[in-house]
């Protein structure tokens, strides 16, 4: 898929830079949003990213050291801390400095999540009853990378449309485990939870960014229309051949059709 191709480009870009370490983790799974969820896996490409990269790029002959840990977020705090200490040892760090760094990292990450929800609540509170916004449904490496998503949120803003990331929504309050007990993709859980939030709020509509060849999305996208409550949404597949003109044409057409849909709703 396109993000994996981009990751190869990022690594190639590092080859000529004066770096000491290249952090290239194998992330197997993520934290659970609910105790009722059995697993929260990353996609197979994310899990095996360092091995895919090594099959295409000679990293052993480089001057820098590759840090290639296997990360299991769902195994709990103590297991994760053990992983992090091992990474630190490979980078030449030990003792109190490492423990302080782990503590600060967790606090900073938690603070960031809280800021996202606070900012999201603030944005939605200011959105009028007859206003609307597009929620960017995506994985973070699509929705948060302006190079990968062709700066789509900013382009929507130029069209006078507010675009917000799905992480602005309080997704942890949505329990999809009853209807999808075997939804073991972490972002599948988040995407379907976001769809339910959108379905309940008449001001929100979805713009789903995916990639050609995305295995998990080929399944998740089949359930999305049902969970979004039958509301119109736009799905855009992006790869290295995508261009501004085609994307903008689809967005403009969707916004035009949305006007008619909203007239019927109101």
Q: What name fits each language-model region?
A:
Residues 1-266:
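An N-terminal assembly and electron-transfer interface module characteristic of large anaerobic redox
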């Amino acid at each position: 898929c396109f993000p994996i191709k981009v990751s190869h480009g990022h690594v190639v870009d590092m080859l000529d830079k004066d770096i000491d370490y290249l952090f290239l983790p194998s992330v197997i799974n993520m934290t659970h949003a609910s105790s009722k969820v059995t697993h929260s896996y990353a996609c197979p490409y994310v899990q095996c990213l360092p091995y895919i990269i090594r099959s295409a790029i000679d990293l052993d002959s480089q001057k820098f050291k590759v840090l290639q840990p296997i990360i299991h977020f769902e195994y709990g705090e103590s297991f994760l801390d053990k992983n992090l200490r091992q990474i630190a040892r490979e980078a030449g760090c030990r003792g109190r400095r490492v423990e302080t760094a782990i503590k600060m990292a967790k606090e900073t990450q938690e603070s960031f999540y809280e800021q996202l929800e606070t900012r999201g609540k603030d944005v939605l509170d200011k959105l009028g009853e007859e206003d609307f916004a597009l929620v960017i449904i995506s994985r973070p490496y699509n929705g948060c990378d302006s190079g990968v998503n062709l700066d789509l949120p900013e382009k929507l803003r130029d069209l006078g449309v507010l675009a917000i990331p799905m992480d602005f929504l309080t997704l942890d309050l949505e329990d999809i485990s009853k209807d999808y007990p075997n939804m073991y993709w972490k972002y599948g859980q988040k995407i379907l939870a976001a769809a339910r939030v959108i379905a309940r709020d008449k001001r929100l509509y979805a713009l789903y960014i995916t990639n050609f060849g995305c295995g998990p999305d080929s399944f998740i996208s089949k359930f999305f229309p049902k969970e979004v409550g039958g509301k119109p949404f736009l799905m855009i597949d992006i790869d290295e051949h995508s261009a501004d003109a085609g994307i903008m044409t689809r967005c403009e057409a969707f916004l035009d059709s949305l006007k008619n849909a909203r007239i019927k709703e109101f």
